[in-house]
């Protein structure tokens, strides 16, 4: 179990992650839809995840969402590297009603984000554009090369939820343990 506390002038976050857990989550960010997304992420990645975030929601949700991405990314970095005995690459396409989102990722320690989704508006108090901010903060702090691509869909709730679930399944697959692999790179270190 990895734990972190991160305090700034905008947020105070305490979080813990068990990468090889059972999908149990306790999430309290004050942003209902975002809590639901983080719970879905933990459930489908099979992580045990706790996040408690007190943020400046009177401004908006941006700082809380981005900083939760930073914290979760840091927890993942601590849990993943140096990468040994894992598949390293993961991908998944997740369907939610009319929507389908694909996630491809590389546990490479080379951060990158491709976010190719067209979503506007808000789901509750969660501005749709915050999804990209979360994924960017997560990828860059975890050291993931992360591609999230909308294949089809219109409903912003369905699109965002499919993206979080696709990330979850792709991460679960990339972190599948395989002792025959050793270091999953010809470089000898990730």
Swiss-Prot record:
* One GO biological process term: L-histidine biosynthetic process
Keyword Translocase, does the record have it? Answer: no
Note the SUPFAM superfamilies from the entry. Answer: Ribosomal protein S5 domain 2-like
Q: Which domain of life is it from?
A: Bacteria
PROSITE patterns, alphabetized: IGP_DEHYDRATASE_1, IGP_DEHYDRATASE_2
Q: Which reaction does it catalyse?
A: D-erythro-1-(imidazol-4-yl)glycerol 3-phosphate = 3-(imidazol-4-yl)-2-oxopropyl phosphate + H2O
Main EC class the enzyme belongs to: lyase
Q: Which GO terms describe its molecular function?
A: imidazoleglycerol-phosphate dehydratase activity
GO CC term (a single one)? cytoplasm
Main location class? cytoplasm
Which compartments is it annotated to reside in?
A: Cytoplasm
The pathway where this protein functions is:
Amino-acid biosynthesis; L-histidine biosynthesis; L-histidine from 5-phospho-alpha-D-ribose 1-diphosphate: step 6/9
Keywords for this protein: Amino-acid biosynthesis, Cytoplasm, Histidine biosynthesis, Lyase
E.C. designation(s): 4.2.1.19
The family this protein is said to belong to? Belongs to the imidazoleglycerol-phosphate dehydratase family.
Q: What NCBIfam families does the record tag this protein with?
A: PRK00951.2-1 (NF002111), PRK00951.2-4 (NF002114)
Q: What is the protein's given name? A: Imidazoleglycerol-phosphate dehydratase
Q: Which organism is it from?
A: Wolinella succinogenes (strain ATCC 29543 / DSM 1740 / CCUG 13145 / JCM 31913 / LMG 7466 / NCTC 11488 / FDC 602W) (Vibrio succinogenes)
């Amino acid at each position: 179990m990895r734990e972190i506390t991160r305090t700034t002038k905008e947020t105070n976050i305490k979080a813990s992650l068990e990468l090889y857990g059972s999908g149990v989550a306790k999430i309290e960010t004050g942003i209902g839809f975002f809590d639901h997304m983080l719970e879905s992420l933990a459930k489908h990645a099979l992580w045990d995840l706790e996040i408690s975030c007190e943020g400046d929601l009177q401004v908006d949700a941006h700082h809380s969402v981005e900083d939760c991405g930073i914290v979760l990314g840091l927890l993942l970095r601590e849990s993943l590297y140096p990468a040994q005995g894992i598949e390293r690459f993961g991908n998944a396409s997740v369907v939610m009603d009319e929507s389908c989102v694909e996630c491809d990722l590389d546990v490479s320690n080379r951060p990158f984000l491709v976010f190719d989704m067209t979503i506007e508006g808000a789901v509750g108090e969660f501005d749709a554009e915050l999804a990209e901010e979360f994924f960017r903060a997560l990828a860059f702090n975890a050291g993931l090369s992360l591609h999230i691509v909308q294949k089809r869909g219109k409903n912003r709730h369905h699109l965002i939820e499919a993206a979080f679930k696709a990330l979850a399944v792709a991460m679960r697959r990339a972190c599948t343990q395989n002792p025959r692999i050793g270091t999953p790179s010809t470089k000898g270190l990730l």
